[in-house]
């Protein structure tokens, strides 16, 4: 068993765990932050995004969705995306790297 604890701060982008093709990332974004300057970023593999706090808008070339604590989003390895923090937001991403 591993217990993982992420960093604290206004802007955090870190990998909490990486083993083979599995990566667990942790992000904290301030309200109104848009990742990658609103440009689509290729997905490194299948991703499950799990908000811990706040609301985040996930934008792909084909759709937009807003997710919050208690929900999750699944992106396929062929997707590209960027995120917009609707509130101050904290989330975890679990990636199966291609």
Locations of regions flagged by a protein language model:
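Ligand-binding loop in jelly-roll beta-barrel domains
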Residues: 77-98
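Short, conserved beta-strand element in jelly-roll/cupin
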Residues: 41-57
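A short, N-terminal "cap"/entry segment at the start of jelly-roll beta-barrel domains
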Residues: 1-28, 36-39
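Short acidic-glycine-tyrosine-enriched beta hairpin
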Residues: 61-78
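Short, charged/polar surface micro-motifs in flexible loops or helix N-caps
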Residues: 21-22, 30-35, 53-55, 97-98
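Short strand-coil-strand connectors
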Residues: 20, 59-63, 86
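Short hydrophobic beta-strand segments that form the core of ligand-binding sensory/regulatory domains
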Residues: 27, 47, 92-94
């Amino acid at each position: 068993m591993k217990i993982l604890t992420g960093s604290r701060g206004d802007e955090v982008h870190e990998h909490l765990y990486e083993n083979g093709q599995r990566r667990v990332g942790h992000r904290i974004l301030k309200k109104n932050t848009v990742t990658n300057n609103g440009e689509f970023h290729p997905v490194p593999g299948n991703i499950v995004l799990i908000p811990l706090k706040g609301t985040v808008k996930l934008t792909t070339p084909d759709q937009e969705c807003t997710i919050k604590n208690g929900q999750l989003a699944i992106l396929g390895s062929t997707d590209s995306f960027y995120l917009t923090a609707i509130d101050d937001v904290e989330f975890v991403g679990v990636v199966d790297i291609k």
